[in-house]
Amino acid sequence: EGANGSPVIVGNIRMGFGHYRISMAMASAAHAMGYTPYWLDLASFKDATGSKVIRYQNDLYSKGSRISQRVGAFNKLVWEPLNSEGFRKLSYNAADQKNAELCVPLFHDIDKDIPYVGTHVWPSQAAVHAGMTHVVNAIPDNWPMALHLAEGSIHTVQTPSAYLGYHQLRGMDPARQLKPM
């Protein structure tokens, strides 16, 4: 039957080719199901504070990634622990939630009831903070990390083990056992 051209917004940050590919895949799938996908790149608004923060974080992450490829000690002592354990902690997510609020003005003229798929947690968090009512947070990683949580959205994952890890908030607070979502 299809969606008869109903709109769906694909929210993204175009942070690296991987996130761009995920966004293109979501837009393509939506189109194949009969939706009209609209691309919302939160990093593309030149003067918006939220966009500037995303671009700065992207630059910082890219720099860290390049250094980690060239300097083994940096990779072992800083980069790997940050990416495997630092982003996993629930406390890390709190700062991202505040940063996402800076993107709320970008949603000012968007109908809050249009279905929305965030292909990174920041667009998902921003959409929730902006009052969007049908937000899907497409989680790209199978390693459960609090970085990927967007409270108030529907979280999608790729595997049963990822589902269990996110459902149980596995390892997101090393000091205590968290209650399942």
Predicted regions and their residues:
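Short, well-ordered alpha-helical microsegments
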Residues: 19-20, 123-126, 143-145, 163-164
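Conserved N-terminal ligand/cofactor-binding loop architecture of enzyme catalytic domains
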Residues: 24-105
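A short, glycine/small-residue-rich beta-strand->loop->alpha-helix junction that serves as a flexible
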Residues: 13-22
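Short hydrophobic beta-strand segments
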Residues: 7-12, 116-117
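Active-site-proximal region of nucleotide-activated glycan assembly enzymes
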Residues: 131-181
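Short His-centered aromatic/hydrophobic patch
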Residues: 119-121
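Positively charged, low-complexity intrinsically disordered leader regions
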Residues: 1-4
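Glycosyltransferases and closely related glycan-assembly transferases
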Residues: 101-115, 124-136
